[in-house]
Amino acid sequence: MKGVVTSMTISEMAKALDLERLSGESDREIESCYISDLLSRVLGGCSPDDVWITVQSSLNMVAVAIMIDVSCVILPEGLTAPDNVIEKANEEGLTIFTSKESAFSLAVKISKIIN
C-alpha cells in the first residue's frame, strides 16, 4: 500500500517517539516490537530486529537482547539502566533508550508508525 511504512530505522523511531538514547550508536531497521519482562518468555517470543520494551535493566537483559539480536531495547516509564549495564551494552553494540511513556503506549505508537 502506498504511504504505509513497513519498517523504519532506530533513529527515525527515536525521533518520532522522543526517546532518550542511553547506549549504542546503531541505526538498524526495526520490524516489530515485543513487550515482556520475563527473560525466558523473551527468548521464546522476541525476534531479531524487534524493539524489545522491558523494565529489565540488568546485565541479563543485555545478554538476552544480544542473543536474540534485537534492534534495540526501550525502558519505559522513565526507567534507566545502571552504569555497568550501559557500559556492557555499548561494548556489545546494543542500543538502549528510555521513555517516560508506558510500555503499552510505546507499543501502540510503534505499531502505528511501522504499519
Task: Identify what each model region corresponds to.
Residues 1-7:
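Short, Lys/Arg-enriched N-terminal segments with co-localized hydrophobic residues
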Residues 7-11, 102:
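Short, structural beta-strand-to-alpha-helix junction motif
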Residues 14-33:
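An N-cap/entry alpha-helix motif that binds or orients negatively charged groups
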Residues 28-30, 39-51, 56-115:
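Feature captures the catalytic cores and cofactor-binding loops of soluble hydro-lyases/lyases
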